[in-house]
């Protein structure tokens, strides 16, 4: 099948912003103007095409990133709508990973809001070129110029307005195009679909001239040939200006700024024009790098149909009609439906059942997907988010998507017996969709523990269990996984003897127990001389100790980081057995652990808080009050980064506390670092609580 749309006319873009800046509304309008929908879905009526999960329509926020395809002129645009809430940063990360460019939507009243900072930094991390769209120009308090200066000051970006608004609030009726130096005014009756071009209004001519000069000066500074022309006083042609804006945008030297009001249908067509004119096609960005699955050598895959096939799975979704959908971004080559591919990350073969082009929540079946495109595949059994798909004879592993470790865990239990079976299956399904959500069973209590990125994240998961899977569940309080260890060397005896008529039991050992370096784990050394304990019984002693160490002597937490040497013992010709030595081993462990000055260990988290200068003192004071140790501070893009080591037990509710202490402008990441001894006073409290 021939290509319908050439690669250079394909755009893979994301729409990113803070909650409520108008992301989903903007996407809806794009779909309306590109002729995909005939009726506009309003978010506040709960009918937006992109927000198709029930919770999204209720809460009016976007949780999963739906991928949609539309055409504008002779270009094809694949749009990924991303959520703006901090607990769903994982969704944003994974969509940015597979995009070529992005539209950052800002609210003309709120300007740069906290989540805009987070999302902007994520886009910097993946080197995604962006256009800024200052939305809601019709709102009371709308201020385009303040929005632009906030992008400069808060995001440390280089915003270059290529449009100016004509009017603001209820008088907002058009924009000045600074490239062509014309005014574009919308006709209200046509839902903003029609507009006419006229001369720039007299009261704006001076301002427009000033901003036109600024724009030309900025783009010339990145292009020597233009600089010469500009300094020589020559006029630049419209095409030269456009090409220069495009090059500087793709090189992330500037961020063009345009404005409009999606809700009032103003400026959306200009936004589409800008996407096509200034954002990169798959050909304009560097070829994707990966490693050869066999040799580990670095290889490149260029965006071309003739290259070997390579794609990255960036999202798994359960669809009520077709089952599991796997969204893939094809970087090179061609994939046909019904063909076999190789998942190089897992080392498994997969068959592609069907290929679908997604439109928010409608789907169109396609026969093949080509380089640079995004599609959903049905029928993949092993593939999860971040896996690479390729042919078996040209294996490559593309750089995967990094997922943060979950930081909050709660126990969950089914309300009824009937819910019990469904709970396990449903949780596994949800975990396959969302890599930042984990499920495990606590060995000691038998409880199911779910962990995720934050309180809202887990709330939505529990909510989805009820709605999609009809499972009723009770959830507990968040909890910490403690450990125990020993601090001095001891030698003890373990003796298990039962001899009262008939076959008896006889196991007898002497062990030495000593602490190991943190993180070394458990080590067993056989130091028996002269066969005082026969060979065949030695593994049984080891097994007995391993079984006993799962429940420590202090508070029943697993015991870690110690070494046991089996040094002596005795046996009985008839009565000795593996069982007897296993019991002797576990008895010896219990006695040794109690004598070797046992202590409690707690997980210490490495916490990084990105905080605006003015809240720094409060944040540091708060971390200190949580038994935290400040490890360092550094300035980064208009904010301070504070790194600290803090016990996990002190971090519950931190997201909420941090949000209120900094008006939501700080963000934090938390990853497990190591286990450390709990201070005596705290340890006594914990033990008392457990023994209750």
UniProtKB/Swiss-Prot annotation:
tr-type G domain ranges (all copies): 8-283
Compartments where located: Cytoplasm
InterPro entries the record matches: EFG_II, EFG_III, EFG_III/V, EFG_IV, EFG_V, EFG_V-like, EFTu-like_2, G_TR_CS
Binding site for GTP: 17-24, 81-85, 135-138
GO biological process, one term: ribosome disassembly
Function: Catalyzes the GTP-dependent ribosomal translocation step during translation elongation. During this step, the ribosome changes from the pre-translocational (PRE) to the post-translocational (POST) state as the newly formed A-site-bound peptidyl-tRNA and P-site-bound deacylated tRNA move to the P and E sites, respectively. Catalyzes the coordinated movement of the two tRNA molecules, the mRNA and conformational changes in the ribosome.
Similarity section: Belongs to the TRAFAC class translation factor GTPase superfamily. Classic translation factor GTPase family. EF-G/EF-2 subfamily.
Name assigned to this protein: Elongation factor G 1
Species assigned in the record: Geobacter metallireducens (strain ATCC 53774 / DSM 7210 / GS-15)
Gene from which this protein is expressed: fusA1
